[in-house]
Amino acid sequence: MGQFPVQETLMKFLKILEKMVLMDVLSVRNVYEDAERAINKKAAIGADITIENFTDETINAIDMIDDLDDLSKQTKKDLLKVGVDTNEENRSGSFLQVDQSNIFTNNSISDSIEVMNMGVALEKYSWLEDYMWNVVKPDADKYTAKTALREKEEGVTSGYFVRSLPGTKEVMPVQACMFISDTDVMQTAHNIVIAEENSELHLITGCATGDDISSAMHVGVSEMYLKPGSKITFTMVHNWAEEVEVRPRTAIKLADNSTYINNYILTSPVSTIQSFPTAYCDGKNSRAIFQSIQGGKKDSIIDVGSRAILNAEGAKAEVISRAVAQDESQIFARGHLAGNVPNVKGHLECQGLVLSDDSFIYAVPELEASSTNLEMSHEAAVGKISEDEINYLTSRGIPEEEAESMIVRGFLNMDITGLPEELAQQTQNMIDMSLDGI
């Protein structure tokens, strides 16, 4: 008689376990079914790209290296342009993906940070599946769908996993790089970044192509999760070739009292890029800051914006954009703030300089308020360089071309307050390097 309750409890447990396994299977199946339905779905904004024009590189076709010093001299130079130090000085970890191969990971520099490729991370942590395709949906458009279906077909997820452990504050940044070394390749990556409770994480990501690459495509899906009291600074530098198509897909989920700072820099020519990272401020007193520098050159089409959805009391967001259009470039500078509850604040600022009669900037500031007692504001201004400023500098013996360059560089300078002193200096160096030639 005494065994029946035990057997009954065991049967209930087995049924619950069976249901959980079934739900996991259905969840995975739904991801891929959603992706299959969206494989031809155009993105809501931006130029439509025919992804069939690009080839799927075999995963892990390139051998791993033991040290970043094993890279060629030219590749090291290309990486340095996007903030990746092959000597790993003042870094807490490193990750390098070339085409579809993770060729280097260094997880041994800091005790506070975990860095690994997604395939290894998924094997180590069963709970990581819960973070995949959560804030970025597989059916958002054909680019996310393609990334999800490649994961299914190849059975391996490309991209990086970075996690700061609870209560730790690592000052030195992790560096991660997505590098394209072959023409006509479509590179995909699915990255997960987690800042555990009361931790601090700094991440520098550089994306670039080899010196001899003409055409290629990059799709990077990044999902970031900030637990209560945590902070992430995410600095991204892009240096693409002129015929590369770029489609980052990024979303961030913020818990109570967390802070997310995003710095984005693009000053090299590109075919087209369309990116609209979204921060969901779901926690009380959470804060999201987006700052971007966009330098349009040649016939680049740049469609870059930032969005913050303020869903919790005390949440704040700032979106600041600086854009300069040269040659025949086109820049669409977007910003979107949505306040859904009382006592939230948001500010959007978009400024642009048009330096050529054949270029243009289209500023799209959006404010959305669906609650009372909130503060939302925006500033937008697009124009040319002031003649008075040029005359002031030339009157002091500075050549006109150099004077114009100085004004543009000053206009594009980014406020890097909020970063640790050591990281602030490194970030400023990256900005200065990116603005070389502007």
Where on the chain are the PLM-derived regions?
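Long, low-complexity, mixed-charge
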Residues: 1-155
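Small/polar glycine-rich anion-binding or flexible loop at a beta-alpha turn
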Residues: 386, 407-413
